[in-house]
Amino acid sequence: MEIYKLSFIIIVLFMIHEFEEIIFIKKFIEKNKVIKDMKNELFVKKKESYPSTETTSLMIAEEFIILSTLLFIASEFRMYEIVLSLFIVYIAHLVPHIYDALRYGKFSPGSRTSFIIFPLGILIIWNVILNKEINFVIFILCVIIIGFLMILNLLFLHKISKKIDKYLQK
């Protein structure tokens, strides 16, 4: 698969999944916050501190800009290792959605698309690894570094989400 096609597929799948979260998250929390068995569910356990829909959208927009920029740069330099690393980190983030849906027996925001995108993503990643020359040392380092930086970014965004909420409500 050509690197630009791979990058395009990644960004489209990312946004479809994120739209599902944005659209359904508040309704899901409201509906399930009083159900005792759901108290540890991914979204419900953070119901008191979960950002507004507007803030969530802004946080996703920031992630979209970063992901798009990195995919563009990596594509320009034909660095499949970086493109695949971004995809793997994104695919890994789907696992908690799948786990919660299986654990609680109901779909949560993002879990529907996770069940579709996860196996598709694994197939795409596997296909690229088999058909392109990948430097596995660089690839593993990129997965670790990008994964670490994406987690830091997400933690940072959640840390400042209350400030963003206040700013957006002015």
What function would you assign to each model-found segment?
Residues 15-22, 90-101, 147-162:
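Transmembrane alpha-helical segments that form the membrane-embedded catalytic/substrate-channel core
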Residues 1-26:
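N-terminal signal-anchor transmembrane alpha helix
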Residues 122-170:
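Terminal transmembrane helical module of multi-pass membrane proteins
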Residues 23, 42-60, 100-104:
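Membrane interfacial helix-start motif at the N-side
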Residues 55-73, 116-122:
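Core segments of transmembrane alpha-helices
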Residues 76-77, 98-108, 131-133:
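Membrane-interface helix caps and helix-loop-helix hairpins in membrane proteins
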Residues 88-97, 108-129, 149:
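Hydrophobic alpha-helical membrane segments
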Residues 21-49, 160-170:
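Cytosolic, membrane-interface loops and tails of multi-pass inner-membrane proteins
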